[in-house]
Amino acid sequence: MRRGDPAPRWPGAVLPRAFFDRVATDVAPQLLNKILAAADGRAGRIVEVEAYAGAIDPAAHTYRGKTPRNATMFGPPGHLYVYFTYGMHWCCNCVCGPDGTGTGVLIRALEPLQGLERMRAARPPQTRDRDLCRGPARLTQAMGIGGAQDGVDLIGAHEGFAIVDDGSAPPADLAGGPRIGIRVGTDLPWRWSVPGNRYVSGPVTRR
């Protein structure tokens, strides 16, 4: 899905650009319980996220500056930054902060809400519903997100994806824990999840 596609439909308000035009570590926990919705009807509640803080974060793709691969992350806030990793998986981030800062939030897990048949068809046979979107690579596969979605405007009316506030508040009194799947920056407590949610990829060790 790209420009010209129908707008995603989900009850609630599409998050405005101002929501994303802030420090990634502020945006990330407030994305919990928001809805990632696709124009084809697939939708899931965001239950796990990680923040990446650009030039001050050795684990960020943008730590060493702008390249053709990470250029989207340096663009305006409120867009998807989709990248290929380990030669086999796509991961998706929301670009945050002012244009040029190279910061964003990795969406790590969704609780599937709608369009489960499409999600199941996109994932390997026999995948349990709990595992459809439990992890960053799984959720992109289930939601139909790949390289073609890099740069999609989440606020644009017809770019295929949006993040929607359906009135569900983020969990209260959240504490961050260390990010996972990285080798540097592991001391930074920039991973958050919905406590007790069975769709989270792994428990957050609070610090």
Curated annotation (Swiss-Prot):
GO terms for molecular function: alkylbase DNA N-glycosylase activity; DNA binding. The keyword Lyase does not apply. GO terms for biological process: base-excision repair. It comes from the Bacteria. Its EC number is 3.2.2.-. Keywords: DNA damage, DNA repair, Hydrolase. Belongs to the DNA glycosylase MPG family. This is Putative 3-methyladenine DNA glycosylase. The lineage of its organism: Bacteria, Pseudomonadati, Pseudomonadota, Betaproteobacteria, Burkholderiales.
